[in-house]
Amino acid sequence: MRLKLFYIISSAYFLSRLTLLYAETIFEDKFAGLNVTFPSGATKRYPDPSKWTFTFLPGTKWPDSYGDGINWLNGNDECQTYVTPFLTQIKGVFIPRDLRYDPFTIKKDGLHIRAQLLSEEQRQAYQTEASYRRFGSGMLRSRESFLYGKIRLVAKLPKARGSWPAFWMLPASFEWPPEIDIFEGMAWGKHAKEFHAGIIPKNTEGKPEGAWYNVGTDLSEDFHEYKLDWTPYAIAGFFDGKQIWYSKTPNSMKKPMYILINLAIGGKWVCNELGILPIDSRKPKRLKEANEIISDQYPSDLIIKSVIVESL
């Protein structure tokens, strides 16, 4: 029995070492930045446009529409608009250069995605029709899609009340569900030491599997690694190398998916979850009032040190 057990343990260890030895890095960005020229003619170190784009979809409605036509921001009642200097017009209306907001800055510690209040003139230029949508922020979407692998992000979360950073995946077929949430953070109030993670399968495959996980450290105080191990059989989430959650892989998640990183602000889940105000989508005045309560917390940054995808 001992010999057999030793053989099993040794074999498992050997296979794990082989995985470490032969795992191939198929995507990597440590955000050193490239010198990118914008439509305005300005040049700046920026996330590599060959690796990332800055909205949910290429070439479709900007900046608030999801792949199947659902208006995602309105669905969540989020209070930000995702923008970039590459966004020069909306619905054929030109955005003046001096009103364009740029949420991305590369510094020594990584890529900063900054959320801040927009001026009234900026909100008009970005056609933010909802009275509560007062913030400008940023989103990254990987141009490449992936099928299985180890997906890692090292990041430091913002402390600002109402912030809702996320690292997640959606199918390359641009449908929803399914969705894999590697983390959703609200590193303030009662969730300062927790993050939310899990999966949302297709409706025919069962209920969403997600929960808050307490990791015992304030996620806004330092950088931490959030990792997903994704195989045809199982999906597992890790925090700083320790497994936190596990789920069987639904059939809808056995196909290529792309990566999203974003910094959302407010919305009914965030406000209700953290008790700013009782919020629902039928009362936009409440969302506007919530914005007034949290607005002194901004600008605030999500800082990303690296994103790496390795083969299994």
Q: Which residue ranges define each predicted feature?
A:
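Classical Sec-dependent N-terminal signal peptides that target proteins to the secretory pathway
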Residues: R2-A23
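GH16 jelly-roll
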Residues: A23-L312
